[in-house]
């Protein structure tokens, strides 16, 4: 579930998703891409549209659409991660109330704010250099919703390190 594809960060997240599929030699199925608008309601509508296809996993471009997706899944009778894996973008402390705990891609918000403030102060102080584009490295926070724990429990002898290597290599 992407964000609005007229917004630069939504395009970047979509491109990252697409590039990851390609890098892993996974098929890109355009009919399984639903554009949302970063609101709960669009995640809910997208959830109903996507879950009818019984996907193995869903990537959602923000936390609010994830809330809507999980509501749709509950109504349909599908369970995360038993029926589908889920990874969301954004991580906030209040997301800890959800079960399963959400696997997220997190931007370094403190670093983003700090670097933005530095650039703004320079600009206010008269710096007329060209605008800069800085790309911050996100962090993948693996929790229950992606299904990793289920994969480990189903792995022969429960060898978590072996299962982790397999997942990271794919």
Which positions does each model-derived feature cover?
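Bacterial carbohydrate/catabolite-sensing allosteric modules
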Residues: 1-170
């Amino acid at each position: 579930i992407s964000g609005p594809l007229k917004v630069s960060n939504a395009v970047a997240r979509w491109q990252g998703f697409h590039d990851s599929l390609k890098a892993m030699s996974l098929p890109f199925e355009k009919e399984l891409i639903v554009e949302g608008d970063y609101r709960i309601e669009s995640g809910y509508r997208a959830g109903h549209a996507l879950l009818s296809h019984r996907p193995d996993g869903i990537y959602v471009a923000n936390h609010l659409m994830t809330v809507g997706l999980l509501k749709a899944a509950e109504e349909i009778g599908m369970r995360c991660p038993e029926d589908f894996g889920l990874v969301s973008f954004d991580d906030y402390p209040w997301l800890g109330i959800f079960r399963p705990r959400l696997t997220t891609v997190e931007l370094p918000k403190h670093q983003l704010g700090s670097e933005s403030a530095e650039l703004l102060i320079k600009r206010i102080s008269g710096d007329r250099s060209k605008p800069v584009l800085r790309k911050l490295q996100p962090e993948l926070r693996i929790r229950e919703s992606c299904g990793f724990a289920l994969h480990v429990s189903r792995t022969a002898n429960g060898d978590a390190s072996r299962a982790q290597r397999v997942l990271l290599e794919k």
